[in-house]
Amino acid sequence: MDLIAVDIDGTLASNRDQMDKYLTGFFASNRRFFKAIRNATVNVEVADRVREIAADTGAEVVVITGRDGTYMKELNQFIARAGLEPKHVFAKPGNDGSNSPAWKDSVIESLIADGNRIIHAFEDTDHEVYLRRGIPVTWVAPIRDYIGEWHYESIDIDPVAWATEQREKKAVRERQKRRLMEGVLAHQKAEAKERQASVAA
């Protein structure tokens, strides 16, 4: 079965304001943040695009989120308000201590093992989990304006171009590392030569 994977926080939900309010400062509260999803603003552009791809391809929608699955009631209320009817909603179990990318990767792995194929994903922070598997991603980039309001820009990322860019970046890092090592060795040789010269004198 073809699937479209959709993240919630910062992707389908334009809720960076809730993150600022509930996850920072002295009164930070994960519980209040997870419950507040029912009042989060729907990113209409993302919701419309998900429905459009689903209509064009016949793919089913799956929600894969790193948020606490203890608050499924609030999460499902939000998803319904966004106008999506996902085949599955995967939220991280409350006692799962793994980080979101690792957990999402395990969900993707199990979906693929069951014979599914993810044809597109919508993500804000964990997009590399999909790109590493060659899955096209719409990255929902959060942008804060000069008065502190959050805006979201959707950017399509081609996995082949992304992989090429990652290889190029890795090659540059390796070249820089080699040059640094060559410089260190040259410096050590020069110091050794100076020591020999001073001993000989």
Predicted regions and their residues:
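Short coil/turn segments at beta-strand junctions that form active-site/ligand-binding loops
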Residues: 1-3, 57-60, 115-119, 135
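Intrinsically disordered, low-complexity terminal extensions
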Residues: 34, 146, 151-176
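Donor nucleotide-activated moiety binding/catalytic core segment of transferases
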Residues: 99-112
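Surface-exposed amphipathic alpha-helices with a cationic face
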Residues: 51-55, 112, 131
